[in-house]
């Protein structure tokens, strides 16, 4: 009988591209993740197609452009990672819906921010929608990844996949972990927090750990500071999506400064990084 673990651990890294020059950077990020994990990379591009009913000529012109973009992405990835298996998909549907559908069959979904409305949070409607609905962990690329600083992770004191992800990322980058905990009114989760941190610290003894306990009114400031000073910001999405709102409504791209990537882990994502057996490879992959 085929092992479920052996199947699900081969789920690909999926990256969404929309046809702009900045997409090359996000493809690079996704390729690095896929190569590190030893899994295939799949590049997904949504083109207007039938959604642009007012201009058949424009829709027909977009499809070849989309195919050309995917060909460029494949060549770029294969130059950097010759042995990496790369697949592509040109889909005739909305980008947000397509990416959420693919997230049910991926181990990691990668998108870039796009401040298309000038809102200041640097995400854009597609990334914001996917952040709330992605089935797998979502990595939001927000510019050049800083080469210094720790990995910051929001922790609750529970045994979660986001905390494991933080230690794995820090060990890979050769840096420390800053565990940020929001103090609960009238409660003390210090012992639980210490236990959760100690468990992963035992597995990664070379990763330094700093603990930062803040009040609720300090969340926005802390996220903004972490976005500018850390290599990676990790948070569990939560069942109500409040952490997503906190991340993309805090900070932004003020002054044109680059912000670190954000990794959002959905509720219920297994601590070992494994997904349910029904999450299978997309048709045509």
Would you name each region that the model predicts?
Residues 35, 41-43, 63-70, 106-114, ...:
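Conserved N-terminal glycine/acidic-rich loop preference
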């Amino acid at each position: 009988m085929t092992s479920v673990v052996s199947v699900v651990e081969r789920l690909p890294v999926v990256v969404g591209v929309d046809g702009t020059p900045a997409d090359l950077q996000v493809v690079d990020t996704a390729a690095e993740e896929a190569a590190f994990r030893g899994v295939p990379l799949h590049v997904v591009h949504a083109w207007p197609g039938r959604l642009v009913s007012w201009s058949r000529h424009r829709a027909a012109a977009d499809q070849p452009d989309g195919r050309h973009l995917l060909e460029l992405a494949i060549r770029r990835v294969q130059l950097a990672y010759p042995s990496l298996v790369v697949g592509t998909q040109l889909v005739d549907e909305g980008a947000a819906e397509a990416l959420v559908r693919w997230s049910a069959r991926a181990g990691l979904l990668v998108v870039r921010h796009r401040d298309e409305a000038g809102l200041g949070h640097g995400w854009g409607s597609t990334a914001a929608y996917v952040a709330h609905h992605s089935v797998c962990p979502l990595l939001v690329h927000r510019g050049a990844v800083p080469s210094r600083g720790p990995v910051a992770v929001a922790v609750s004191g529970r045994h979660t996949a986001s905390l494991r992800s933080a230690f794995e990322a820090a060990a890979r980058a050769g840096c420390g972990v800053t565990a940020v905990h929001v103090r609960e009114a009238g409660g003390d989760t210090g012992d639980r927090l210490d236990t959760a941190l100690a468990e992963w610290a035992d597995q990664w003894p070379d990763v330094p750990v700093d603990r930062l306990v803040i009040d609720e009114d300090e969340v926005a400031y802390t996220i903004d500071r972490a976005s500018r000073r850390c290599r990676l910001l990790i948070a569990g999405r939560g069942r109500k999506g409040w952490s997503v709102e906190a991340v993309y409504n805090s900070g932004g791209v003020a002054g044109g400064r680059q912000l670190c990537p954000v990794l959002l882990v959905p509720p219920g994502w297994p601590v070992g990084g494994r997904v349910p057996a029904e999450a299978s490879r997309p048709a045509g992959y």
